[in-house]
């Protein structure tokens, strides 16, 4: 709805032409500005501005629907509401089948914990034949930090799915379905994802991976406050792209040190603010996701990868379909493997805090375990 063209709404021709002349093309362009900003830019009176905004808002607002009609619509379109299997049984069961289509899924954790390994395994799964639990499609893998390894992907395939990868030519075919892009700047990345919207459906793309979004923004050498408007546009575009294309979009996020003022950024953490003050030694060692609270609200699924006392753990920290659960895992030649399919339910501040204790001795597996 936000991308609906103003020129196609039936707005009065005169005011519609003024919007077009000032390069305000979509409903989002108009509704992202204040009335005073529009009045100054378009050089028309407040009465006309308010009338136009009211018309555009009404034209783009979806009609009211009952819970019953939404359920019926979901049932009718169940084939569009699938999941990409992670081939980690406990995690797939928790997520009702795997990484869901049509939404943003975030992997957040310290360097070397296994985020890129997880992404490469997902890319492999998406390219696999349906008969073997895959999506039989292509993958676009935006490799910002040059961590993608074709050799590692093939190794994972040979170890995890030998019955498929030992077939003649299958390894080359699977690797050939993964298109790797390496943007050199945020501007280059922005241009690339804008071009993807039409090609995704035409080329049977079944997964988009961005590894990592944090690295793209940190390369701009701008303070965090100045990066937020840029991040806001990318959040909106990626959510729209996921919904439009009905594919899973997986984005990795790095971590930074948590300061004491951030302990109440989540509602449940506000309740333990006093506890935090009395226990700073424990909480000062925690990390938080680098992209901040606005990004955290934008993602539908958040998987936190952390290390406690030398043990890797993957947590389902945010999901509309399950309680917060934690699974211990390790990384082998086959990729990430759960040590137990029975997750431990989490409560309180442990859901979103990120540990990296005893982690430094685990980051050199195959030379790349990010």
From Swiss-Prot:
Gene3D superfamilies: P-loop containing nucleotide triphosphate hydrolases. One of its GO terms (cellular component) is Rad51B-Rad51C-Rad51D-XRCC2 complex. GO terms for molecular function: ATP binding; ATP hydrolysis activity; ATP-dependent DNA damage sensor activity; DNA binding; DNA strand exchange activity. It is found in: Nucleus. GO terms for biological process: DNA repair; double-strand break repair via homologous recombination. ATP binds at residues 109-116. Preferentially expressed in flower buds and roots. Keywords: ATP-binding, DNA damage, DNA recombination, DNA repair, DNA-binding, Nucleotide-binding, Nucleus. Belongs to the RecA family. RAD51 subfamily. This is DNA repair protein RAD51 homolog 2. It comes from Arabidopsis thaliana. The lineage of its organism: Eukaryota, Viridiplantae, Streptophyta, Embryophyta, Tracheophyta. The gene is RAD51B.
């Amino acid at each position: 709805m936000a991308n609906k063209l103003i020129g196609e709404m039936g707005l009065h021709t005169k005011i519609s032409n003024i919007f077009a002349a000032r390069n305000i093309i979509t409903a989002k362009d108009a509704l992202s500005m204040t009335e005073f900003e529009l009045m100054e830019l378009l050089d028309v009176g407040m009465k006309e501005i308010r009338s136009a905004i009211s018309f555009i808002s009404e034209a783009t607002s979806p009609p009211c629907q009952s819970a019953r009609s939404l359920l019926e619509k979901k049932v009718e379109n169940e084939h569009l509401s699938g999941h990409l299997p992670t081939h980690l049984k406990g995690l797939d069961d928790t997520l009702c089948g795997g990484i869901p289509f049509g939404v943003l899924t975030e992997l957040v954790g310290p360097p070397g914990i296994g985020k890129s390994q997880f992404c490469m395994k997902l890319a492999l799964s998406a390219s696999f034949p349906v008969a073997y639990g895959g999506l039989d499609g292509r993958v676009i893998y935006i490799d910002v930090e040059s961590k993608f390894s074709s050799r590692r992907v093939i190794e994972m395939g040979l170890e995890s799915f030998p019955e498929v990868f030992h077939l003649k030519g299958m390894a080359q075919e699977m690797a050939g379905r993964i298109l790797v892009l390496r943007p050199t700047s945020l501007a280059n990345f922005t241009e690339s994802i804008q071009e993807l919207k039409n090609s995704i459906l035409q080329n049977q793309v079944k997964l988009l991976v961005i590894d990592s979004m944090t690295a793209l923004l940190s390369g701009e050498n701008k303070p965090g406050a100045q990066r937020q408007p840029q991040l806001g546009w990318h959040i909106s575009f990626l959510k729209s792209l996921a919904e439009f294309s009905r594919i899973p979009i997986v984005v990795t996020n790095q971590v930074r040190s948590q300061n004491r003022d951030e302990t109440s950024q989540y509602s449940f953490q506000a309740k333990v603010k006093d506890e935090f003050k009395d226990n700073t030694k424990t909480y000062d060692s925690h990390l938080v996701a680098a992209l901040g609270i606005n990004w955290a609200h934008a993602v539908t699924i958040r998987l936190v990868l952390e290390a406690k006392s030398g043990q890797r753990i993957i947590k389902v920290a945010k999901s509309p379909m399950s309680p917060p659960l934690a699974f211990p895992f390790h990384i082998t030649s086959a990729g990430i493997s759960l040590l137990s399919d029975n997750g431990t339910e989490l409560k309180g501040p442990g859901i979103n805090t990120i540990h990296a204790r005893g982690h430094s001795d685990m980051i050199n597996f195959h030379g790349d375990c990010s």
